[in-house]
């Protein structure tokens, strides 16, 4: 626990240096962590409201509300007893240099993966997933993508750095297999012939969680999986603090149940993106993101 004198701190507001007050390790490559948390304070690829650069800090700050619980409900065990997780802070890049951010993030992830670590990353806008996929594909080969979002982000018309184009480029670069990838919660215009399976928000809200999960697992098969969660997958009633909100989304409860249900998949990398705290109300968006990130760690710990 990252506190003065290594003393226990059950405060809901203090000592928010690392996510969940987990240990800080600014040189995590040679350590013995299972998962390494990295922030990417970048929002230069945003098409709507900016501010995602403040997302990692907001997620870490609100995570103090989650740090006190030992045997977390409904898991009935403490993730920290099964996984060694550290927070290495934020990727460093020159302000305004999107290419440097992309290069530095990819190199950082490649180095972590080469040393046997796994990556949980906080955005920042959703573009950050593309350099992460490049790093993971070098290590794991072509992957399946499980993608929670209001948008498919498969648009071909964007610029080089655009948070709506990553999943157009990723299949073309051979990073992911669309035939084994699924996009959950979509409720905006998209190309229907790009190979991805789209489970739109209306059907995800109307079908049972068990039914949706069964389809996801059937599509993914036994490929290694990269899990990415854009917080605008949630309805703005549950996550107003994001750059491109779209009504008609998932509840936080349904999203948590779906993430928990991915436990059996071979998830090799994860991220939570697009929290823009300037538009948040009572930190509910940041809290949703922090809780989803924690559940992602719990589905890994449950395998131990």
From Swiss-Prot:
<feature type="binding site">
    <location>
        <position position="149"/>
    </location>
    <ligand>
        <name>Mn(2+)</name>
    </ligand>
</feature>
<dbReference type="InterPro" id="IPR020855">
    <property type="entry name" value="Ureohydrolase_Mn_BS"/>
</dbReference>
<dbReference type="GO" id="GO:0008783">
    <property type="term" value="F:agmatinase activity"/>
</dbReference>
<dbReference type="Pfam" id="PF00491">
    <property type="entry name" value="Arginase"/>
</dbReference>
<comment type="pathway">
    <text>Amine and polyamine biosynthesis; putrescine biosynthesis via agmatine pathway; putrescine from agmatine: step 1/1.</text>
</comment>
<keyword id="KW-0661">Putrescine biosynthesis</keyword>
<feature type="binding site">
    <location>
        <position position="126"/>
    </location>
    <ligand>
        <name>Mn(2+)</name>
    </ligand>
</feature>
<dbReference type="InterPro" id="IPR006035">
    <property type="entry name" value="Ureohydrolase"/>
</dbReference>
<comment type="function">
    <text>Catalyzes the formation of putrescine from agmatine.</text>
</comment>
<dbReference type="GO" id="GO:0030145">
    <property type="term" value="F:manganese ion binding"/>
</dbReference>
<feature type="binding site">
    <location>
        <position position="232"/>
    </location>
    <ligand>
        <name>Mn(2+)</name>
    </ligand>
</feature>
<keyword id="KW-0745">Spermidine biosynthesis</keyword>
<dbReference type="InterPro" id="IPR023694">
    <property type="entry name" value="Agmatinase"/>
</dbReference>
<dbReference type="InterPro" id="IPR023696">
    <property type="entry name" value="Ureohydrolase_dom_sf"/>
</dbReference>
<keyword id="KW-0464">Manganese</keyword>
<feature type="binding site">
    <location>
        <position position="151"/>
    </location>
    <ligand>
        <name>Mn(2+)</name>
    </ligand>
</feature>
<keyword id="KW-0620">Polyamine biosynthesis</keyword>
<protein>
    <recommendedName>
        <fullName>Agmatinase</fullName>
        <ecNumber>3.5.3.11</ecNumber>
    </recommendedName>
</protein>
<dbReference type="GO" id="GO:0008295">
    <property type="term" value="P:spermidine biosynthetic process"/>
</dbReference>
<keyword id="KW-0479">Metal-binding</keyword>
<dbReference type="InterPro" id="IPR005925">
    <property type="entry name" value="Agmatinase-rel"/>
</dbReference>
<keyword id="KW-0378">Hydrolase</keyword>
<feature type="binding site">
    <location>
        <position position="230"/>
    </location>
    <ligand>
        <name>Mn(2+)</name>
    </ligand>
</feature>
<comment type="similarity">
    <text>Belongs to the arginase family. Agmatinase subfamily.</text>
</comment>
<feature type="binding site">
    <location>
        <position position="153"/>
    </location>
    <ligand>
        <name>Mn(2+)</name>
    </ligand>
</feature>
<dbReference type="GO" id="GO:0033389">
    <property type="term" value="P:putrescine biosynthetic process from arginine, via agmatine"/>
</dbReference>
